[in-house]
Regions:
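Glycine-rich, basic loop-to-helix element that forms the pyrophosphate-binding segment
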Residues: 54-70
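Conserved donor NDP-sugar-binding/catalytic core segment of glycosyltransferases
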Residues: 87-120
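Short, flexible, basic/aromatic active-site loop/helix in glycosyltransferases
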Residues: 116-148
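Acidic donor-binding loop at a coil-to-helix junction in glycosyltransferase catalytic cores
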Residues: 159-171
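Non-catalytic, C-terminal membrane-associated alpha-helical segments of glycosyltransferases
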Residues: 203-213, 218, 222-281
Length: 281
């Protein structure tokens, strides 16, 4: 039977208490960012837990460390605030046996709190570019050998602790599609996550829109990115009203992000120029 391995990106861990907190019942790797550099192992309930502690920073870098140490057949991407349901491992392996052509499957996760409303999978369906940006990394299980064959890793420019605050999961999925991997949704809940608060979301502010522009440029090019920015605003105009910014101001900020991405210019060095103008500074 294929082996499932959970890859957890975490910080500041001193022990293996996350095994119980996350209800893990499979092999697991904790990529732990801290001030130390060390390697630990623990056997539990017939499974093996590994903890790789490094002084690196950035969620993409952390996930890549977990990928480097992984030896499972199916890899389940995770954050340390996820709690898995009983039988998640069996459910995931069963799903791959039912959809053998899939290189990766995207599952359902129950969200506790109102910060994020996750799109719910209702059927087994192929993921394409048009719907690829609807899913986060912690819903993804993927065949390790496919990632190796396609040389796919997480970006180190997007996500917590990097230049741009979010988007590493979107780029991971996009990269899989670009390199010909077959991704499907699967309508089974495998976990729940409390997202009453967020480690990176600080509201629909100038930096949010600047980083969105940079993400769309990273995924495509500056011309398609501008189109994606406009359609994003049109689809989410009710949400974006919370920003207090006009349509033109938001587009200008996104365009700054598109321009800044060419030289990996962060918001603090580029986007704030618009913010100052908006505030009359």
């Amino acid at each position: 039977m294929p082996k499932l391995q959970v890859l957890v990106a975490t910080m500041g861990q001193k022990d293996f208490s996350k095994i119980e907190e996350m209800n893990i019942a499979s092999d697991v790797i904790f990529a732990n960012q801290s001030d130390d550099t060390k390697y630990d192992e623990k056997r539990f309930d017939g499974y093996l837990a590994k903890m790789i502690t490094t002084g690196t920073r950035g969620v993409g870098c952390n996930r890549n460390i977990a990928l480097e140490y992984a030896d499972g057949d199916i890899l389940l991407i995770a954050d340390d605030d996820v709690k898995y349901i009983v039988g998640y491992s069996e459910a995931i392996l069963k799903a791959f046996s039912e959809v053998p052509q899939a290189d990766a499957l995207i599952f359902n996760i129950r969200t506790v709190g109102k910060f994020v409303e996750r799109r719910k999978n209702k059927q087994i369906k192929r993921v394409h570019y048009l719907n690829a940006l609807n899913y986060g990394a912690v819903r993804i299980a993927v065949k390790r050998k496919k990632l190796i064959a396609k040389n796919i890793k997480f970006t180190t420019c997007f996500g917590g602790g990097t230049i741009y605050s979010a988007g590493e999961d979107s780029m991971f999925i996009w990269d899989m599609l670009k390199k010909g991997m077959k991704i499907y949704t699967y309508p089974v809940v495998i976990a729940e996550v409390d997202q009453t608060t967020s480690s990176w979301f600080r509201g629909y502010n100038c930096k949010y829109f600047y980083d969105k522009g940079a993400l769309y440029c990273a995924l495509t090019n500056k011309w398609i990115a501008r189109f994606l920015c406009i359609q994003d605003l049109l689809r989410h105009q009710t949400l974006f009203k919370e920003s207090g910014m006009t349509f033109r101001q938001i587009i200008d900020q996104m365009d700054k992000g598109i321009q800044g991405y060419k030289t990996l210019l962060p918001y603090k060095d580029n986007g704030r120029n618009i913010e100052k103008n908006m505030l009359g500074g």
